[in-house]
Swiss-Prot record:
One of its GO terms (cellular component) is plasma membrane. Residues 1485-1498, 1508-1521 have a biased composition (Acidic residues). Glycans are attached at residues 147, 260, 306, 345, 405, 662, 710, 737. The gene is Cirl. Keywords: Cell membrane, Disulfide bond, G-protein coupled receptor, Glycoprotein, Lectin, Membrane, Phosphoprotein, Receptor, Transducer, Transmembrane, Transmembrane helix. Proteolytically cleaved into 2 subunits, an extracellular subunit and a seven-transmembrane subunit. Residues 1-774, 830-835, 904-927, 997-1003 are extracellular. This is Latrophilin Cirl.
């Protein structure tokens, strides 16, 4: 090692501006065979003062304490040799060997010693003061201490008590640092109030020594120091201007005290006790820079500081250049103290103080100074803090550029600050609690050891002397080793000497006497008076000595047992040992042998029982030789090993040792450590044959607990002679109580009970939390638990929103496991180890964590299997797979925990906290390994899923697959983030628990990381698994409004039901452009055309679009009203324009989102409920009657607009006065969904027609037996008529005068309404409900035709059929299911009539199932529109479509039907030419049975049946052909679905007509059907659209566009073509009209024009376009859940 020379600057106190630079004196050593390296700073040269190769001290380079070497060994030419190598050089290196210097004293291990100075090159010619020679050269006087030590303190050289003997330099242990000398060592004398203690030497690791300084600066001793130690000096640094205030005072000696202080910058907790090994031979050389050592005043010893030393503590280099101030330096030295009759001087942290053994003993004693964590009752009191605050030390610059003429020198403070912070919580402590006197041996025992090794020595005499010495003399650590060695030697020699005694009795007597002496000696060693002797040994030596004592006693006992040849029992009882030697004849052994007897050993109630069979099988010659022993106080020696502690923390050892010394203050700490103590006396048993062999039958031990309070977890153990430690192998705990434990062992040796100590002052894991962290942990766990519960309730309450899928089941189980983990953790951290719930909590927490990780793995696997199988296109219940997940998850977890319990149940109870298993092999095998396997599998499957998604994204997929792929991609992303958060939470919790146990500095960081990550985990679950789902958001709002127990402010929330406003014309509410879509994506790219308009646009249509932007939804009830402006939603996409939208845009109906999916920005109907959406359609307006004002369907003024033009103004003004202005922005549009189930893969099933209703209650829509084209919703229709007001607070506006001819009908409706309120929810199934509604429409069709004829007044219509009264009676007796809206809309809401007929006509409400399933794709080839158009002349579109299907062979099962748009006159004219084809479809068996009673079977029905049969046969081929078609188009799908739906209802309506004897008129359709024709006197107007059916015939937009634009047959059918408005489009539900539009209608639809219009239409060309009429736009989309949505245009005012 290198020592860097330093110049010591001594400044005069009289002249602060002048400094005299004095080179610093240094000493370096190198053991024989090693190199001595000397190095000075740049610009400085080596100036040698003296040198010697030989030996002047017995301690330097003497690790083994050899005292026979000569200490007067000197090579005279040593200085000459060194000068030739090092003089006037900056650095040099010299080998300390006889080849270089010669051998002045053969047989003595020598060392090279050099005294030198580092002087600047300019001062090499100046004269320097030669310091005094080393003290061991000048002083040879008698000792000054009465303990026989011939040492004096080196500061007393040259004066005081005459000549003093030189202090021997003693070796130290490897890996430790000496305490004195230059370059970072202290040698501080005590205050003048007491005698100067022996000197302390400066040793380096492995006995290597540091240089000794002889500076003479003194500092003031501050008041308040309890230990009487001088504080480190203040260092004032000025750039090139150093002011050192010194006041020389006289210390206790006549020569100024020599001292030098250096504060280390970085240390760590030291734990090694004692030491061993050999010197590594390296010499530690310290580089030192110049420094100042100012004193403050008055008197006191001197402490100088070396501000930039490079030191090594425990083989760790410490850079002291950035050291902290004096407040830290006071904590870097252990104070002087007296221990074991020795005075231990102040010692630097990391150094080992070495000195000769006390008087009467030979050898050396050592004691180390280490840093330890402060205890709560830290000795760093206010006085220390005040002292630390008044003195600061700033590091010196190491460059040497700060000359005394300069102004200032700024010191670096960064490192000092860091060191200051690190050392603030530590304090210097002597370690271990007592000095290490392992090498100290008494002269008496040394004499006995020499005697026992002599050939003719008397063993009995030696044993007697040994027992006397051990009982009367003070022993040291080395004496314990010698004594046990003598015991074993005596027994070995007696084994050979006993043969010299021919007489058996004499032989037994001699051995018995020897045994008595040995037992007495052992008892003396165990006596309390010799406890300090045991503590002189390090823990390893203590275990070795104890093992040697036990084996020596046992060996001597069996020496006697082998000598006895007959049955006999010998008992040796002394103070601390009871020894029993029994020789038994096997024939006399009748039962088990018990030791000890109750009267033999009153000290303890322990007993050991040997079974008879084990004794007999270990007999020899018919005799069984047994040795029993019971020990007192041995339990305080044989301490358990602390291998489960981190040995880097010395506090663990200090606490454990404190139990041995009953030092409660030393054991009090701020961290609950798990301590294992020996909680019973030690009892021993051995058999002669094999002694420690395995037994066929186990022995039974009953051991009494020494401590009954605050102990737990008893463990039966035996002492392993080989490992010198306690082991539990072969022993088990049979039973235990508060005072005793019963053990069973299958071998013999020394037994005891180990138990855990529980700190009575600290009860749980929370005791180590500070106040803030404890609160934060409670808050974090509470937040996470609340959000997990919300997620679970969401999946349960709103399960109708989702298809029951494997992913949903997986997440439910993940949430359950996480909830269990959070709750168990919260309970576990509050439990103590003594709690009965501690083990149970750990077991269940283990199981919950394993289950949670396994579900994460299965979630990743499920995503992977979804991408690699057909599940990508199917999201249905997967019960078999989920059942496998359940079995593997919970079954595997429980199995692992059960195995862990079987292997080692104590794993769950032996840890410090009740939330963590003990870190052993079982823990790593059953906890860490499975968790890592599951996590790695989850990461692997996630990685594979990403690869597959990347591949699929580059291939051409159908729209449905792209949508599903986007959903899976989003799920995988969310799951991966979820996985990362959960891993962070668990890792932070684990490292926090482990770090808190070891008291690591980063423990707090882990704790707060756990708090943050756990809170984020709860928020993530709620946001990304609940809030991000649009359906769940909608269901939350519905749920809030449907429950009366919630606060009214929540149920009447003004937040929009959906996520935006559907507005036309590109404007939203309030005149803003919120509804405008700004995307440049074309409809072609989006694959979902939104709409188009005809080339001709009249002023009326434009006004309608402008007024539609001002509409708003209003949902009202008796207690709340949604009549305010809806919240705007920022649209992130734009208006989708393209070739299909040539002139006008539909406005802000749809938003384009990721994955090329569209989402609505409109509103859902306020009558929607969970799992369904209500769509309300009105009867078509009869435009030739006096125009009736259209009302908003959700407003209470519906009937106020149904008056004539003359009375409309007054009533509108009346309504306006009620508070709702006509100019307020209001709109009403409807939303409905539909989906379709994919092809069934479960074999060929008998399919019903489209819309067939399953037999299960409420329609089991997900049966796998359904057809490929099965529509997954079954509409329910509610026929309502105008009646009482729906809103009492608008009673005047809602009670219009009723026509006189409808009084009887209204009376019937009043009775019917009362029945509805009393008999709700009575229909057993959707099948019954659908049949009921079909019957109602048939009845209403008949009644409405009569009313229209009477209202027209131009012709007399025939009276209603005779069975009309019967229909009305049945109509009143029917029971209906009443659907309430979110705001409790009553029946009156459904009684709001439409504008048809004199009484307004019925309003039909369609309830569509909102199931999350995949829709069936339809291709263009399914509908040959050209053929349909060519065959549609003079026929209804339904008949033409039936013919087209029959001719073309539909692939998808179920017939097609477009909405008929021809007038009634056209249908009547063409009826005779058309082939009547029944509108029946392939129905279920129950539907066919109902039709068997029908007497009429038309040709159309036969044709239809043939088509169904053909479809049944070609099912599988159709499924194959489907994969080769063109990419799907949402418009085709929508057209097909609605056509099938309309046809299904039409079939039911016609069946009702046939059942009641009415003629089946395929041109006369129900008023709710798309083909329904309500003409009468107004034949040119079409009926209202029921559902929204698209037509492909003459009157359809599709046919018109075919004719006008001549599109190719392969062109796709767009949504805007199917649902757009225009001259040829099918009529949609009517839109409200502006006052200007209504006046125009009054002029156009006058009675005169009505006749001419009727006549003209009756004879018009079939190909001519019908006149303009008010229609409403309909836009469609496919949302992220693969559900088709349609939005009707808002009603214009």
């Amino acid at each position: 090692m290198v020592l860097q020379g330093a110049k010591q600057r001594l400044c005069s106190s009289k002249n602060l501006d002048t400094c005299v630079l004095t080179p610093k004196y240094q000493t370096a050593y190198a053991c024989e065979g090693k190199k001595l390296t000397i190095e000075c700073e740049q610009g400085e040269l080596i100036n040698l003062i003296r040198a010697n190769y030989g030996r002047f001290s017995i301690t330097i380079c003497n690790d083994h304490g050899n005292v026979e070497w000569s200490v007067n060994c000197m090579f005279p030419k040593s200085l000459t040799v060194l000068n030739s190598r090092c003089a006037h050089k900056n650095s040099c290196s010299v080998l300390a060997a006889t080849s270089m210097f010669g051998d002045p004293c053969p047989g003595t291990h020598k060392y090279l010693e050099a005294h030198y100075q580092c002087v600047s090159a300019a001062q090499t010619s100046t004269t320097t003061n030669r310091p005094s020679p080393p003290p061991w050269v000048l002083n040879n006087g008698p000792p000054i201490f009465g303990n026989g030590s011939g040492l004096i303190h080196p500061t007393n050289i040259g004066g005081g008590s005459g000549g003093a003997s030189a202090p021997p330099r003693l070796p130290t242990l490897p890996g430790v640092v000496g305490i004195n000398g230059n370059g970072g060592m202290f040698n501080v004398p005590p205050p003048a109030t007491h005698a100067t203690p022996p000197g302390s030497t400066a040793t380096l690791p492995g006995g290597r020594l540091k240089g000794v300084a002889t500076s003479t600066t003194t500092t003031k001793h501050p008041a308040g120091r309890r230990d009487g130690l001088p504080p480190p000096p203040q260092l004032h640094h000025h750039h090139n201007h150093h002011t050192d205030e010194t006041t020389p005072t006289k210390p206790s000696g006549k020569v100024p005290a020599a001292s030098n202080a250096t504060a280390p910058s970085n240390t760590r907790i030291l734990t090694g006790v004692g030491g061993g090994g050999t010197d590594d031979g390296t010499l530690l050389t310290t580089k030192s820079s110049p420094n100042r050592t100012p004193g403050t005043a008055a008197s006191g010893p001197s402490v100088s500081s070396n501000g930039s030393a490079v030191r090594t503590i425990n083989n760790i280099n410490l850079n002291a250049a950035g050291m902290a101030g004096a407040d830290d330096e006071t904590k870097l030295f252990c104070g002087p103290t007296h221990a074991r009759n020795l005075f231990w001087n102040m010692t630097r942290v990391g150094d080992v103080n070495v000195q000769p053994c006390p008087g009467g003993a030979a050898g050396i004693a050592k004691w180390r100074c280490v840093l330890m964590k402060r205890m709560p009752d830290s000795s760093f009191d206010e006085d220390d803090e005040e002292m630390a605050g008044t003195s600061t030390t700033t590091p010196m610059s190491t460059s040497g550029d700060c000359l005394h003429n300069s102004s200032s020198c700024e010191p670096p403070v960064t490192m000092a600050h860091k060191v200051n912070q690190r050392l603030r919580n530590f304090e210097p402590t002597w370690h271990p609690l007592t000095p290490d006197l392992t090498q100290c041996r008494s002269l008496w025992l040394n004499n006995l050891e020499m005697r026992v090794n002599q050939r003719d020595s008397s063993l009995i005499s030696i044993a007697n002397d040994m027992s006397e010495v051990t009982s009367s003399k003070t022993l040291y650590g080395g004496d314990m080793l010698v004594t046990t060695k003598i015991i074993q030697t005596v027994s070995e020699k007696m084994l050979h000497d006993k043969e010299t005694f021919p007489d058996q009795r004499q032989r037994e007597a001699m051995i018995m006497e020897l045994l008595h002496c040995v037992v007495k000696t052992g008892s003396n060693l165990l006596d309390e008076s010799q406890l300090s002797s045991w503590l002189d040994l390090n823990p390893e030596d203590q275990m070795r000595v104890a093992t040697s004592l036990l084996t020596g006693l046992e060996y001597n006992a069996f020496l006697l047992a082998d000598t006895i040849i007959r049955e006999r029992s010998v008992v040796q009882k002394v103070k601390n040992i009871l020894l029993s030697v029994r020789v038994l004849e096997t024939k006399t052994i009748q039962s088990s042998v018990v030791f000890p007897d109750s009267d033999q050993w009153p000290i303890s109630s322990d007993r050991i029982e040997l079974p008879r069979a084990a004794l007999i099988e270990n007999s020899e010659g018919g005799l069984v030789r047994i040795v029993f022993a019971a020990f007192d106080r041995l339990e305080s020696i044989l301490k358990p090993s602390y291998d489960h502690f981190d040995l880097k923390s010395s506090r663990s050892y200090v606490r454990n040792t404190a139990i041995l010394t009953n030092d409660s203050d030393a054991s009090a700490g701020d961290l609950q450590q798990r301590l294992r103590i020996l909680n019973s006396k030690v009892i021993s048993a051995s058999l002669g044959k094999g002694r420690h062999i395995q037994l066929s039958q186990p022995i039974t031990l009953t051991l009494k607990h020494l401590k009954t309070e605050n102990v737990t977890n008893p463990t039966c153990v035996f002492w392993n002679y080989i490992d010198h430690a306690w082991s539990a192998n072969g022993c088990s705990l049979e039973s235990t109580n508060r005072t005793h434990s019963v053990c069973s062992c299958n071998h013999l040796t020394n037994f005891a009970i180990l138990m855990d100590v529980v700190d009575e002052h600290q009860h749980s894991l929370f005791t180590m939390f500070d106040g803030n962290m404890r609160i934060f942990i409670y808050i974090s766990i509470a937040i996470c638990v609340v959000f997990i519960v919300i997620a679970l309730l969401t999946l349960k309450l709103f399960n109708g929103v989702f298809v029951k899928s494997a992913r949903t089941s997986i997440y439910i189980n993940i949430y359950i496991c996480l909830l269990a983990i959070e709750l168990l953790f919260l309970l576990g951290i509050e439990q103590t180890e003594t709690s009965i719930f501690c083990g149970f909590i750990t077991v269940f927490l283990h199981c919950a964590i394993l289950s949670g990780t396994s579900w994460f793995c299965y979630e990743a696997f499920h995503s992977y299997s979804t991408l690699t199988s057909d599940e990508l296109l199917l999201e249905v219940d997967q019960t078999p797979k989920v059942n496998c997940y359940y079995l593997l998850s919970y079954g595997l977890s429980l199995s692992v925990v059960a195995i862990s319990l079987v292997i080692n149940p104590s794993t769950y109870t032996q840890n410090d906290y009740c939330v963590l298993m003990e870190a052993n092999a079982v823990f790593y095998a059953t906890f860490v390994a499975p968790v890592l396997i599951f996590f790695m599998a989850a990461i692997g499957y996630t990685f594979l899923s990403w690869i597959i998604m990347c591949r699929k994204s580059r291939t051409g997929l159908k729209t449905k697959e792209h949508t599903r792929l986007a959903t899976v991609r989003f799920d995988i992303r969310c799951s991966f983030v979820f996985f990362l958060l959960l891993s962070a939470v668990w890792c932070s919790a684990y490292f926090y628990l482990r770090g808190a146990k070891m008291d690591e500095d980063v423990t707090g960081i882990y704790g707060y990381n756990f708090i943050c990550f756990n809170t984020l985990l709860g928020l993530y679950i709620f946001v990304f698994h609940c809030i991000q789902n649009e359906k769940i958001r909608r269901e939350y709002r519905k749920y809030v409004r449907q429950h009366a127990w919630l606060p009214k402010c929540l149920r009447c929330s003004k937040t929009s039901i959906s996520s935006g406003i559907v507005a036309g014309g590109g404007t939203g509410l309030g005149g803003t452009n919120a509804g405008t879509l700004c995307s440049v994506s074309t409809a072609k790219k989006s694959k979902l055309p939104l709409g188009t308009n005809d080339d001709a646009h009249d002023e009326q249509q434009q006004q309608q679009h402008m007024s539609a932007t001002e509409d708003a939804i209003m949902g009202a009830s008796s207690d709340c009203e949604l009549n305010e402006a809806q919240q705007r939603r920022t649209l992130k996409s734009g208006l989708i324009t393209g070739t299909l939208q040539p002139s006008q845009s539909l406005g802000g109906h749809v938003v384009l989102e990721r994955g090329n999916t569209l989402r609505s920005t409109g509103h859902a109907s306020p009558t929607s409920s969970a799992g369904s959406t209500h769509l309300i359609f009105a009867h078509k307006q009869q435009q030739q009657q006096p125009p009736l004002g259209e009302a908003y369907y959700h407003q209470p003024d519906y009937y106020s607009w149904k008056q004539t033009a003359g009375g409309m103004k007054a009533q509108r003004e009346y309504y306006n006065n009620a508070g709702a202005a006509t100019s307020s922005p209001q709109q009403a549009h409807e939303v409905f969904y539909w989906t379709q189930k994919p092809n069934s893969q479960h074999g060929k099933k008998k399919r019903g027609g489209v819309g067939a209703i399953p037999a299960s209650p409420s329609g089991s829509l997900h049966s796998r037996a359904t057809a490929a084209s099965q529509v997954l919703f079954y509409p329910s229709y509610k026929k309502t008529k105008p009646g009482q007001q729906a809103h009492p607070h608008y009673a005047e506006a809602l009670d219009p005068p009723q026509p006189p001819n409808t009084a009887a009908y209204y009376q019937q409706q009043q009775q019917l309404r009362q029945q509805r309120q009393q008999q709700q929810q009575q229909l057993s199934s959707d099948e019954e409900q659908a049949e009921q509604h079909a019957h109602l429409l048939h009845l209403q069709h008949q009644q409405q035709q009569q009313q229209q004829r009477r209202a027209g007044g131009q012709q007399q219509l025939p009276a209603p059929p005779p069975h009309m009264a019967q229909y009305q009676q049945e109509f009143m007796q029917r029971q209906y299911r009443n659907k309430h809206s979110n705001c409790d809309l009553g029946d009156a809401y459904y009684n709001q009539g439409s504008v048809g007929g004199a009484d307004g006509g019925p309003v039909y409400e369609e309830i569509l199932s909102n199931r999350n399933s995949d829709a069936q794709h339809y291709e263009v080839g399914d509908f040959d529109v050209d053929e349909v158009y060519n065959n549609s002349v003079g026929t209804g579109v339904f008949n033409n479509m039936r013919a087209a299907v029959a001719a073309g062979g539909s692939r998808y099962g179920g017939s097609l039907s477009g909405g008929s748009v021809s007038s009634r006159n056209q249908q009547q004219q063409q009826h005779s030419l058309a082939q009547p084809i029944s509108a029946r479809r392939c129905t279920a068996d129950e539907d066919d049975d109902e039709d068997e009673d029908d007497e009429e079977t038309t040709a159309a029905e036969q044709l239809h049946d043939g088509v169904c049969d053909e479809e049944e046969e070609d099912e599988e081929s159709d499924m194959e052909d489907d994969s080769h078609g063109l990419p799907p188009q949402s418009a085709e799908r929508m057209r097909r679905l609605m056509a099938l739906q309309d046809e299904d209802f039409k079939r039911r309506f016609q069946r009702q007509q046939r059942k009641h004897g009415a003629p089946v008129d395929y041109g006369t359709l129900p008023p709710g059907s798309a083909q329904a024709v309500i003409g009468g006197a107004h034949p040119e107007h079409n009926g209202a659209v029921f559902g929204v059916s698209g037509g492909v015939g003459e009157g359809s937009m599709r046919g018109a566009l075919r004719q006008q634009h001549a599109k190719s047959p392969s062109a796709r059918l767009a949504v805007n073509e199917l649902f757009g408005h225009g001259n040829t489009g099918p009529p949609l539900p009517p839109a409200n009209q502006t006052p200007a539009q209504k006046r125009q209608q009054l002029q156009k639809l006058s009675p005169q024009s009505t006749t001419s219009s009727s006549s003209h239409t009756s004879h018009s060309n079939p190909h001519s376009h019908p006149p303009h009429h008010q229609q409403r736009h309909l836009s469609a989309m496919l949302d992220e859940n693969n559900t088709v949505r349609c939005y009707l245009e808002p009603l214009a005012k």
